Amino acid sequence: MNFTTQSTTGPQSQRYSRRPGLRNSAVPLHQRLLSKKSHKQQDSPLFSLIPPEVRAKIFTYALSDYEDTRRPLLYDSKVSFWRPSHRAPRRTSTELLRTCRAIYRETWFLPFPLKEQIHWICCDSDVPPGSGQFNGNAKKLALVLGEITQQGQEKVEIESFHVFANTRRLEHGDLSALLSIPGLHPRRITLTIRYIDWWGWDWESPDMPLYFKADWISAVSREISPSTSEFRIELETLEHLKDRVDAIGSHIAEHWFFGRFGGTILYADVSGKCHQVSRWSGSSAWYKKRRTSYPKAKGRKLDYYILTITFESELSIKRKGGVVSETAKRNAADPLFKHVSANLGDPSILERYGPPSHEMPGVPMLPLPDEDDDL
């Protein structure tokens, strides 16, 4: 899947500034602003007293994106995409860039790398309004990165790249296609599998075992930028089904890795010390609406459980007191290794949700952890 775009209607018209003195120029606005000398602002404590490294932290804080929780923009708490830190659209306040040329010189490039790039690889009904479609957003990102390259800028590293994915779309290669966009260099990638995004999880039979195929990992590993030092996988389910996610998490930490053979490899902590567990409660209205024969949820709230497994360098894991699985290291040392899927039940569930079972590799069933076991 190629997200690069090319005009089919001839050359595009240039964008010109409406500001006096900046009109009728094909030179990008930031280049024109930076080409002129700026006042040193020595009368301002921001420049005369505060060290540059401290000033950079202040600017980073001011230009980081945030939830715009003004009343008209808040998402309905009863929809599937409402969740902590995603209650409203995110925005960046850029007023700081318009204060003076000296500040602009130090900050003009910050809004893009500081903004968390969020992409939704799932059903359109489970995506916040205004988020756009997957292909369209990917093309926009490709255009922005292409413009940065054309301007001769050095590699721009994005702080955070967050993907919400349905496991079926994930297994079809949409994430690897997204990461293949030229010029994309995220420092941290977060992949969130919501409780509604599991392939083989049926609203009529929510206790059906979960299944997480692994064929997508090799393609993603080929596309990960050398700038990526963390790859987080967030596995979400309902609180009373958390044992299933814990079992899948144990399998992932012991067997999976990200990275190219001969290059930097990102592992997970098999001891569980570096894993994170979070919980939140949300409306049961959306859940009840899609449940017919299964017993209805009691009350107005449902409790959700999220297990976060972070893949990072072996050195980073050891510094945190964690342990890298010897199995994962052996797997990473084998250039022909194929990742083993995580299966909590009969693979025949795929006959309903995906390719025929004869197309799937043999997948071992995973035992559920005992109640006394710590992940």
Give the role of each language-model region.
Residues 2-11, 15-26, 160, 165-375:
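Eukaryotic C-terminal
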Residues 1-160, 296, 304-375:
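Short, surface-exposed structural microsegments at secondary-structure boundaries
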